């Protein structure tokens, strides 16, 4: 993974993980996968969620499960796609909830969520790579251990963060977060399969900003 870099603050926090045997095995697995098959995102974007949202600047964490696995979609940020790529259904539903919740259209660049990242929104997938057209193909190889360590580091070393946990997989991560120190907001996944079961109407975006303001933190322009 020579192309990969990670922001200095995250590197300091996660150095113990880099030094563990599971991460060495994970690195070997991912390197071999990139050698043999089309893998997403491009290798230079594996740690992009961390690189674009420094540890000390995180205000909000949105958890995804897997990168997009079709050509041109994955850019290393959960739910985000590059500008010019058609907006996937889950992201379309996120934008719809923002519009009804805040009364404003989503402040994004096409389907790219970089405008959020630049304000301190960490868009973290639990698994950071995937084989083309094979959803979940890189689960169970160590990425989840690594990203759990990142979530735990934020939960223990920072305060007054907002964790947006959408869907049953993300909601299980609440066990790592102290609700006395952070705001945890849970809802069904924004996928068309589940958005009507409680994602629509959850008002997570206005509730996030109310909490941030309450603690003297600049709100997110969603």
Curated annotation (Swiss-Prot):
Subcellular location: Cytoplasm
E.C. number: 3.2.2.27
Active site: 66
Protein's UniProt keywords contain Hydrolase: yes
Gene3D superfamilies: Uracil-DNA glycosylase-like domain
Alphabetical keyword list: Cytoplasm, DNA damage, DNA repair, Hydrolase
Catalytic activity line of the entry: Hydrolyzes single-stranded DNA or mismatched double-stranded DNA and polynucleotides, releasing free uracil
GO biological process: base-excision repair, AP site formation via deaminated base removal
Entry GO MF terms: uracil DNA N-glycosylase activity
Transmembrane region(s): none
CC annotations in GO: cytoplasm
Pfam family membership, one: UDG
HAMAP family reported for this sequence: UDG
Job description of the protein: Excises uracil residues from the DNA which can arise as a result of misincorporation of dUMP residues by DNA polymerase or due to deamination of cytosine.
UniProt record similarity statement: Belongs to the uracil-DNA glycosylase (UDG) superfamily. UNG family.
Stored NCBIfam families: PRK05254.1-1 (NF003588), PRK05254.1-2 (NF003589), PRK05254.1-4 (NF003591), PRK05254.1-5 (NF003592), ung (TIGR00628)
Protein name: Uracil-DNA glycosylase
Organism encoding this protein: Porphyromonas gingivalis (strain ATCC BAA-308 / W83)
Gene symbol of the encoding locus: ung
């Amino acid at each position: 993974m020579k192309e990969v870099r990670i922001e200095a603050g995250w590197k300091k926090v996660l150095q113990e993980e880099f030094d563990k045997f599971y991460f060495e095995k994970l690195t070997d697995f991912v390197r071999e996968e990139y050698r043999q098959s089309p893998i997403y995102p491009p290798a230079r974007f594996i740690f992009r969620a961390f690189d674009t949202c420094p540890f000390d600047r995180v205000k909000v964490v949105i958890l995804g499960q897997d990168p997009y696995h079709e050509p041109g979609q994955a850019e290393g940020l959960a739910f985000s796609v590059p500008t010019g790529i058609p907006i996937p259904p889950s992201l379309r539903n996120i934008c719809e909830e923002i519009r009804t919740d805040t009364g404003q259209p989503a402040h994004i660049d096409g389907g790219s969520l970089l405008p959020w990242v630049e304000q301190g929104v960490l868009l973290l997938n639990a698994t950071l790579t995937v084989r083309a057209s094979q959803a979940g193909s890189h689960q169970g190889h160590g990425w989840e251990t690594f990203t759990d360590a990142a979530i735990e580091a934020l939960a223990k070393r920072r305060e007054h963060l907002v964790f947006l946990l959408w869907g049953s997989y993300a909601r299980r991560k609440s066990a790592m977060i102290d609700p006395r120190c952070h705001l945890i907001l849970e809802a069904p996944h924004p996928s068309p399969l589940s958005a009507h079961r409680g994602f629509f109407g959850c008002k997570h975006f206005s509730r996030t900003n109310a909490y941030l303001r309450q603690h003297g933190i600049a709100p997110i322009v969603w």
